[in-house]
Amino acid sequence: GNNRGLAAASGDYLVMLNNDTVVTRGWLLTLLRHFQADPQLGLLGPATNHIGNESMVPVAYKSIEEMPAAARQYTLAHMGELYPMQTLAFFCVMMPRTVYELVGPMDETFGRGFFEDDDYCRRIEQQGFHMACADDVLVHHHLSASFDKVDGGERQMLFERNKSYYESKWGAWMPHRHRPQRRN
């Protein structure tokens, strides 16, 4: 999957984007501008409505039809803002080709999912780069649309196996968390 796409991609920046996402106007150019402003930025993802880490933000829409207007309002209120993160979920990420060439392909030992994104983030950190969530980009995510088709027992077995493999490489895994909510 991802490794084949990354190897075939051309251009100075690479994007991994799941098929269970809906992007908004200007998302790609806005991500690109952050890289142009910060040469130490190694990986960047958008804010989103639904994910198991700090990229999730409160959204003001109830339907996909309302999403573009609500996303525009949110992103305009957060223009230029980056939220530093140690681990991004790969439902939507961008990286410079130079970073990909230093870090290399994703570790295929992880197989179908769980921890491959955590592992890749550790490898990016090893090369001296940092990661962030671009709060001025919002991408809608229908969380785990394809993974929900996997049997619960099989999913748990894959999680435990990959967690063990990740920890053999990097030490104890720190569970993802959501960011603290802002008080107005």
Positions of predicted regions on the chain:
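Glycine-rich, basic loop-to-helix element that forms the pyrophosphate-binding segment
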Residues: 1-9
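A recurrent flexible, glycine/aromatic-enriched loop bordering the glycosyltransferase active site
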Residues: 7, 50-51, 55, 63-98, ...
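Short, high-confidence coil segments that cap the C-terminus of an alpha-helix
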Residues: 11, 38-41, 129
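Short aromatic/hydrophobic "clamp" motif used to bind/position activated sugar donors
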Residues: 14
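Catalytic metal- and UDP-sugar-binding loop of GT-A-like glycosyltransferases, i.e.
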Residues: 17-19
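Conserved donor NDP-sugar-binding/catalytic core segment of glycosyltransferases
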Residues: 21-60
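A short, conserved alpha-helix in the catalytic core of glycosyltransferases
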Residues: 26-32, 80, 84-104, 109-138
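Active-site-adjacent helix/loop segment of glycosyltransferases
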Residues: 52, 58-59, 118-184
